[in-house]
Amino acid sequence: MRIALGLEYDGSNFSGWQSQKGVRTVQATLEQALSAVANEPVTVITAGRTDAGVHAAAQVVHFDTATFRLEHNWVFGGNANLLPEVAILWAQPVNEAFHARFSAIARHYRYIILNRGARPAIANRRVTWYCQPLSVTKMKEAGAFLVGEHDFSSFRAKACQAKSPVRNVHYLEVTRQGDWIVIDISANAFLHHMVRNIAGVLMAIGKGEQPPRWAEEVLQARCRAVGGVTARPDGLYLVRVDYPDHFDLPRLSRPVTVW
């Protein structure tokens, strides 16, 4: 049978999602916990592979198993075997047509910036701190150039393995609440480092280093070298993955906040 899971994790102390020898990863941690519940080896497929230090409030995975367990047994049993930084939120049997990655129709990320003079303590490694003033007005103006279907070569990592750099950004919003600046972005899919590179460009514009139209110039250049610095992973969260309604999967009631 095929089981879908929703989970959240604090990525601060993980070397990313994907299993790698000799380092702690979210995938390996989850597979070890689920294997203990299933009494057999379990391999999970994820909706999106997050980088080292990146967090998730609503990651989705699936796995195949010959072991029958009630839904709450996968949740409680899995969580009993997981590290505190990872939690299974829900479990649901799905038909074999469901695929956590390929069935997804949209992914939503949130990038959180603490924009104040003093560094964070409680939110350390869970937000990106920037001490100089940032103009949300300029960041909003710049973000509008990136909405729609474009070649995002300037925003992909050098090691990105995606066959095509074309992605469709459904929306990109920048908001401020007190000292907090939030970048919300949704697309059909994302390239490696795409959100962090977009955040880096918007922050450079917010600082006043570049005008808002620079975002369009970077996009049109189709060259990573012109795109400036990749933003830190600390403030990045995967907050939702959308699937066609007929799969009838649970959804979080609200995205992550830290205020």
Swiss-Prot record:
MF GO annotations: RNA binding; tRNA pseudouridine(38-40) synthase activity
Presence of keyword Phosphoprotein: no
Single Gene Ontology BP annotation: tRNA pseudouridine synthesis
Enzyme class: isomerase
UniProt xrefs under InterPro entries: PsdUridine_synth_cat_dom_sf, PsdUridine_synth_TruA, PsdUridine_synth_TruA_a/b_dom, PsdUridine_synth_TruA_C, TruA/RsuA/RluB/E/F_N
Assembly, per entry: Homodimer.
Similarity-based family: Belongs to the tRNA pseudouridine synthase TruA family.
Protein name: tRNA pseudouridine synthase A
Protein species of origin: Nitrosococcus oceani (strain ATCC 19707 / BCRC 17464 / JCM 30415 / NCIMB 11848 / C-107)
